[in-house]
Amino acid sequence: MSQPVKIAIAGANGRMGRAVAQALEGRSDAVVAARFERPGDAGEGLVARETALAAAEAVIDFTLPEASVALAEEAAANGGPALVIGSTGFSDEQLDRIDAAATKIVIVRSGNYSLGVNMLMGLVRQAAAALPAQDWDIEVFEAHHKRKIDAPSGTALMLGEAAAEGRGINLAKVSDRGRDGVTGPRKDGDIGFSVVRGGGIIGEHSVIFAGESESLTLSHSAIDRGLFARGAIAAAVWVKGKPPGLYDMQDVLGFKK
């Protein structure tokens, strides 16, 4: 039997850090090797970031974009460990820096680590390809808890990208994210985004295909935060032995052709 993958947890005291630690309890294929927070943060069981990186084969990181970029660059400079990044809200410049780090180490980055959402992406891509833009409008709806700081969510953007891929277009050219006041009629082919923030909503996502006489809605609801933790752990186990590069959850699940 192979040895369990040694995992370090970034942002260990956060909601997702705690969820990852809980999800690792009792597993035979992965184990907590270290827990760490931001430099200067102290707490029981926490170690310095450099100590955590040295102890781990993979780091699971649900923190903030700037922290994830710094972590990726430090890991790349040291030749590892692998990273599983679940942070969202990156700028283009930050994504470029993660891409550069992925030339030296294995990085899995995804806006959502759930099986259901990744299945939903395929359904959205298929529906978008089958339903012509002149007859069917696409709207991505998402709702999250009031503490989430980025919008649209990383998952909503993934779903928008899937819809754009299905239609063979660039999402950046058709994305409509800010409706307020007199906006005029909707443009054919636009992919709209609607956002709700409130309470303790874990994550609700729907993609609406709206025609003149009928509509189709594809949806996913997160019941508990542990599903994201379990998916990230699956990714951390999957990276073992993989060559340096940038991967996503579609790779982990074998959904890519």
UniProtKB/Swiss-Prot annotation:
Keywords: Amino-acid biosynthesis, Cytoplasm, Diaminopimelate biosynthesis, Lysine biosynthesis, NAD, NADP, Oxidoreductase
Catalyses which reaction(s): (S)-2,3,4,5-tetrahydrodipicolinate + NAD(+) + H2O = (2S,4S)-4-hydroxy-2,3,4,5-tetrahydrodipicolinate + NADH + H(+); (S)-2,3,4,5-tetrahydrodipicolinate + NADP(+) + H2O = (2S,4S)-4-hydroxy-2,3,4,5-tetrahydrodipicolinate + NADPH + H(+)
Enzyme Commission code: 1.17.1.8
Gene Ontology BP term (one): lysine biosynthetic process via diaminopimelate
Enzyme class: oxidoreductase
Active site: H144 (proton donor/acceptor), K148 (proton donor)
CDD domains: DHDPR_N (cd02274)
GO molecular function ontology, one term from the record: NADP binding
Entry binding sites for NADP(+): R38
Matching InterPro entries: DapB_C, DapB_N, DapB_N_CS, DHDPR_bac, NAD(P)-bd_dom_sf
Localization (cell): Cytoplasm
Pathway recorded for this protein: Amino-acid biosynthesis; L-lysine biosynthesis via DAP pathway; (S)-tetrahydrodipicolinate from L-aspartate: step 4/4
Family membership noted in the UniProt record: Belongs to the DapB family.
Known role: Catalyzes the conversion of 4-hydroxy-tetrahydrodipicolinate (HTPA) to tetrahydrodipicolinate.
The protein, known as: 4-hydroxy-tetrahydrodipicolinate reductase
Highest classification ranks of the organism: Bacteria, Pseudomonadati, Pseudomonadota, Alphaproteobacteria, Caulobacterales
